[in-house]
A protein has these predicted regions:
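Conserved glycine-rich cofactor-binding loop
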Residues: 5-7
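Conserved glycine-rich Rossmann-like NAD(P)H-binding loop of the short-chain dehydrogenase/reductase
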Residues: 19-36
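Substrate-binding pocket helix/loop in short-chain dehydrogenase/reductase
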Residues: 89-90, 94-99
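Active-site loop immediately N-terminal to the catalytic Tyr-X3-Lys motif
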Residues: 91, 144-150, 201
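Active-site helix of classical SDR
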Residues: 113, 155
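Residue(s) in the substrate-gating loop at a strand-loop-helix junction
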Residues: 139
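C-terminal helical subdomain
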Residues: 172, 179-180, 187, 195-237
């Protein structure tokens, strides 16, 4: 899984490890990734393999899939967790930030799915009662536009669409994909908004972890293309 060193990804990795999954975890920053791997293997007792990789570098993305395949030869759950977001009015968004968000949030996810699909199909064929899953951390901004998050929202809309394409092409073979679409979750990523939204009013990492875990338990007869998780009251449907 990508984006596993912090935040939501780390929470999902912890829970999957406790559920008995062997894990390949990835992020860019090696020291923090190594610490996450040590903490995860202490908690779970299972195999945890850290692979430092930058999702803007295609060779890193391919190396990540290869490293997992060589070690395990199967892939039950691919979690697309790595993501970046920058807030700016549409008119003032730089092309550099546009490219970075699309590279990490969409291109890397596409390449990961493309390269992992044969392994996911093989795993699903060998375990037809469970199948194999792709879980993408998308965003509510991919469903409803949010001021100042035009590019981020567009990347997450593309990720939701990528999950739908996986379902269209591979769910008959037991490989299904779910895009989880939350509003603001209390992590490092939302530090910039804490002055106007208190962390206690944000969705909890554990709320998203529960959704991800539920998806892993579904039979291949049930495809859940997306799950929207919104904050309550006046914030319904908003980030
Ligand atoms: N927090 C929210 O409110 C929220 C809401 C909706 C959706 N999401 C989505 O959920 C996912 C996780 O968000 P989070 O809040 O947990 O974020 P976070 O705490 O900022 O963690 C982001 C993770 O992605 C990794 N990452 C970032 N850029 C990367 C790159 N270029 N290559 C490889 N790894 C990279 C980070 O590790 P390194 O920095 O070491 O690379 C880290 O492990 C993201 O896709 C985000 O868009 C978050």
């Amino acid at each position: 899984m990508t984006g596993a060193s912090r935040g939501i990804g780390r929470g999902i990795a912890r829970r999957l490890g406790k559920a008995g999954y062997d894990l390949t975890i990835s992020a860019r920053e090696g020291t923090r990734l190594q610490q996450a791997a040590e903490e995860l293997s202490d908690i779970t007792g299972g195999s945890v393999h850290p692979v430092a990789a930058d999702m803007t570098a295609e060779k890193d993305v391919s190396r990540l899939v290869r490293a997992h395949d060589e070690r395990h030869g199967r892939l039950d759950v691919l979690v697309l967790g790595a993501g970046v977001g920058f807030s700016a009015p549409l008119a003032q968004t730089s092309k550099r930030r546009y490219d970075l968000q699309f590279d990490v949030n969409v291109r890397a996810a596409f390449v990961l799915v493309q390269e992992a699909l044969p392994l996911l199909r093989k795993t699903a064929a060998g375990r037809p009662e469970h199948g194999a899953k792709v879980i993408a951390l998308a965003s509510i901004t991919g469903l409803f536009a949010e001021p100042d998050l035009a590019v981020y929202g567009a990347t997450k809309a593309a990720l939701i669409s990528l999950c739908q394409s996986v379902n269209a092409e591979a769910s008959d073979d037991g490989v299904s994909a779910t895009a989880i679409c939350p509003g603001y979750v209390d992590t490092d990523m939302t530090a910039w908004v804490r002055d106007r939204i208190e962390p206690r009013r944000m969705i909890r990492v554990d709320d998203i972890v529960e959704m991800a875990l539920a998806v892993t338990k579904l039979s291949p007869c049930a495809v859940v293309p997306d799950i929207t998780v919104t904050r309550p009251g006046r914030q319904l449907g908003r980030a």
